[in-house]
Swiss-Prot record:
Family: Belongs to the ThiI family.
Broad EC category: transferase
Gene of this entry: thiI
Chief place of localization: cytoplasm
Protein name: Probable tRNA sulfurtransferase
């Protein structure tokens, strides 16, 4: 095995000043959590980069596959090592460059000599390795500025280290470095994408889903569980709070005029979410709303909905159009699950002509004739909580159940 370690370059952490080490510690914890199945990882941190020691090829492959999903990483590189003699360096350089034989590339060799006792200076090492590698590959040509491949060589005190591949990371900030919020997870396309974007900004998420049996099926709930589980691959556990919402929706249908019933439904959801948020110690509520996309997402509707709380409502998709949201959903792997045709509570009892510019005072007047507070308290108390990611044995049980 030639691979010795993985070098990780930080994303926005490089701009964080005195708080930088807190962000780095959070990133290290998230990496350990994401790869807990690999056992204890040996991670060394520096102010501008992080190193993960590699023990075998299987571990290396798992890390290379999973690290691009961890927020806070700008890029990373597999690093190989060899003895500190020119012959070993040349042979390692050939081995690394063998992986770039598929098409024409420009390249250069960049050398850093940390061990000043090594007899050759950096420029001499550069000429030796470059002059040895170039004749071995017909597809390579030298380019000093912005080459396709930069073979980086570092002569340290213990060994010589080399890297040539720079793999893009997810960028952003480590999940958990910017507090916790509650995501309203509907099961549609938008809300998982909103959750992803907030995680990218370092926000740890719990999720809330409104379930209205028998009007919504068990399949719709299972779909949301899959989406919650999908979001955990970006670096953290997620607790999903499932709210029994049938009583509240039936009362809205019976007592509130149909043209503002959707506004009231969203207001009651927000009231429930705010109580759960307070219980779990979250600082904000996250939604997948996009301005003007549907009747409940006009400025007038959002104003009427927001009026039930002083809690910050974060809407990362507010200026995105539907095609942009779909494209991102496809990229993060939630789209195919989101489009499964199972109704959620937002699609049942949908009025034929909902108000796009509801008046807050009228909505409050219609709601004043019903005691929603008691139903809200009961829904919060009777919620079910699921923790994701699922353990492997639980996933196997689900697959077996699908066969029955």
């Amino acid at each position: 095995m030639i691979w010795k370690e993985i070098l990780i370059r930080y994303g926005e952490l490089s701009t964080k000043g005195r708080n930088k080490m807190d962000f780095i510690r959070r990133l290290r914890e998230n990496i350990r959590h994401a790869f807990a199945d690999l056992g204890h990882l040996h991670i060394r941190t520096e102010r501008d980069r992080m190193f993960i020691a590699i023990e075998n090829d299987a571990q290396m492959q798992t890390l290379v596959t999973g690290l691009p999903k961890i927020f806070g990483i700008q890029s990373f590189s597999p690093v190989a090592a060899c003895e500190k003699d020119m012959e070993s360096m040349k042979q390692l350089a050939i081995t690394i460059m063998e992986t770039f034989k598929d098409q024409p590339y420009t390249f250069k060799v960049e050398v850093k000599r940390t061990d000043k006792t090594f007899p050759l200076e950096s420029h001499a090492i550069q000429r030796e390795i470059g002059g040895y590698v170039l004749p071995q590959f017909n597809n390579l040509s030298v380019k000093v500025k912005q080459p396709d491949i930069e073979l980086r060589v570092e002569v340290r005190h213990d060994a010589t280290y080399m890297m040539a591949q720079v793999i893009p990371g997810a960028g952003g900030m480590p999940v958990g470095s910017n507090g916790k919020s509650l995501l309203m997870l509907s099961g549609g396309i938008d809300s998982p994408v909103a959750g992803y974007l907030m995680m990218k900004r370092g926000v740890r998420l719990e999720a809330i889903h409104f379930f209205s049996p028998p009007y919504t099926s068990q399949n719709s709930l299972e779909k949301v569980k899959v989406l919650a589980n999908e979001l955990t691959k970006f670096g953290a556990n997620i607790r999903l709070h499932v709210i029994p919402f049938t009583e509240i929706q039936v009362l809205i249908k019976e007592k509130v005029p149909s043209n503002v019933s959707m506004t009231t439904t969203r207001r009651m959801m927000l009231k429930v979410a705010d109580q759960v948020r307070e219980e779990i110690g979250a600082l904000a509520i996250v939604t997948g709303e996009s301005l003007g996309q549907v009747a409940s997402q006009t400025l007038e509707s959002l104003t009427a909905i927001n009026a039930v709380t002083n809690t910050p409502i974060l809407r990362p998709l507010i200026s995105s159009d539907k095609l942009e949201i779909i494209e991102l959903a496809e990229q993060i792997g939630t789209y195919e699950t989101s489009i499964q045709p199972f109704e959620d509570c937002c699609t049942i009892f949908t009025p034929a002509s909902p108000k796009t510019k509801p008046k807050l005072e009228k909505v409050e007047h219609y709601e004043s004739f019903s005691d929603f507070d008691e139903l809200i308290a009961r829904a919060v108390k009777n919620r079910e909580v699921y923790i994701f990611p699922k353990k492997e044995e639980e996933q196997q049980q689900d697959k077996f159940a699908d066969l029955l």
